[in-house]
Amino acid sequence: MSWTIGRPDAEAPEDRMAASHLFTRLDDLVAWSRKHSLWPFNFGLSCCYVEMATALTPVYDQARFGAEVIRSTPRQADLLIVSGTVFRKMAVPLYRLYSQMREPRWVISMGACANSGGMYDIYSVVQGVDSFLPVDVYVPGCPPRPEALMEALVLLQSKIATEARPLQIRMGETGPARPFDPVPRRDALREARMAVTRLADPEAT
């Protein structure tokens, strides 16, 4: 037991310590710092990239999310934003760029073409970037507005703040890795889509 001597009207040592110390878990502190310091690496392929470039203008103030510094190399980035149509010949370079990013790393799929192939249901277009990359947030639209990308950043920040991945990464053969099921969401929901026999009235919603 320790004793301290002070004036009766002086502030208690416990109160002084509470005012000058911050108590938190290390996982939460690391997640908080990472969610407010995203370093994006943009991979623009078609018209969705125009909307993404618009989101970088001062009108939308992407600096509010700590993601205004676009990196020129994937080795300095932890967020990959794929915007536009991903052709099969571009899938390999895109995967190489993703593999050069350090863990932890996140992926945003922006636009209908990146999400599911969009209107291009043909042999030369990848039907969803999630068939070879683990996507964290999907941004719908053709093309999506810059506000949709801002919402995606907010969703990604909330995901980063709650996940325990920053300090609990599973080690793979070549370095840190995380589980990834290479089944596109479009294929996973195919049976449910094919079972639909009646479409909802858009005027009723």
UniProtKB/Swiss-Prot annotation:
Signal peptide: none annotated. Disulfide bonds: none annotated. It is an enzyme of class 7 (translocase). It holds the Pfam family Oxidored_q6. Its EC number is 7.1.1.-. Binds 1 [4Fe-4S] cluster. Keywords: 4Fe-4S, Cell inner membrane, Cell membrane, Iron, Iron-sulfur, Membrane, Metal-binding, NAD, Quinone, Translocase, Transport, Ubiquinone. It is found in: Cell inner membrane. It comes from the Bacteria. It is a peripheral membrane protein. One of its GO terms (molecular function) is iron ion binding. InterPro entries: NADH_UbQ_OxRdtase-like_20kDa, NADH_UQ_OxRdtase_20Kd_su. Gene3D superfamilies: 3.40.50.12280. It catalyses: a quinone + NADH + 5 H(+)(in) = a quinol + NAD(+) + 4 H(+)(out). GO terms for cellular component: plasma membrane; respiratory chain complex I. Its cofactor is [4Fe-4S] cluster. GO terms for biological process: aerobic respiration; electron transport coupled proton transport. [4Fe-4S] cluster binds at C47, C48, C113, C142. NDH-1 is composed of 14 different subunits. Subunits NuoB, C, D, E, F, and G constitute the peripheral sector of the complex. NDH-1 shuttles electrons from NADH, via FMN and iron-sulfur (Fe-S) centers, to quinones in the respiratory chain. The immediate electron acceptor for the enzyme in this species is believed to be ubiquinone. Couples the redox reaction to proton translocation (for every two electrons transferred, four hydrogen ions are translocated across the cytoplasmic membrane), and thus conserves the redox energy in a proton gradient. HAMAP family: NDH1_NuoB. Belongs to the complex I 20 kDa subunit family. This is NADH-quinone oxidoreductase subunit B 2. It comes from Cereibacter sphaeroides (strain ATCC 17023 / DSM 158 / JCM 6121 / CCUG 31486 / LMG 2827 / NBRC 12203 / NCIMB 8253 / ATH 2.4.1.).
